[in-house]
Amino acid sequence: MTMYATLEEAIDAAREEFLADNPGIDAEDANVQQFNAQKYVLQDGDIMWQVEFFADEGEEGECLPMLSGEAAQSVFDGDYDEIEIRQEWQEENTLHEWDEGEFQLEPPLDTEEGRAAADEWDER
């Protein structure tokens, strides 16, 4: 799992990875049908992004499906509004780091560490 500090960096990296995984296709001929994204909040409050592109709609990856068809192709082609993508993101799907390298939608409340993390998240 590789995370990036900006959504733009994550999209660029995912585009490069898609092309590397499909060696016979160049960027102009790529046919992308699905755009997946995942937002992370680290313990220090930094926000990180992970993005994936897929040639077939419905493919599963590490991230959540966000756009499909022409919308996914537009993002792949660089024709997108980062603010719009951020606004479309559903905050309840954001993963929070509660222990180093361990991410969850919510901290576990059955441990003192989890309760402390929940209190910190509530303060933000």
UniProtKB/Swiss-Prot annotation:
Indicate, by first and last residue, each region the UniProt record lists as having compositional bias (Basic and acidic residues): 112-124
Stretch list, region Disordered: 96-124
Q: Which cysteines are joined by disulfide bonds?
A: none
What InterPro entries would the database entry show? MsyB (IPR025729)
Q: Name one Pfam family in it.
A: MsyB
Q: Which GO terms describe its cellular component?
A: cytosol
What is the role of the protein in this entry? Answer: Could participate in the normal pathway of protein export.
Name of the protein in question: Acidic protein MsyB
Organism (species):
Escherichia coli (strain K12)
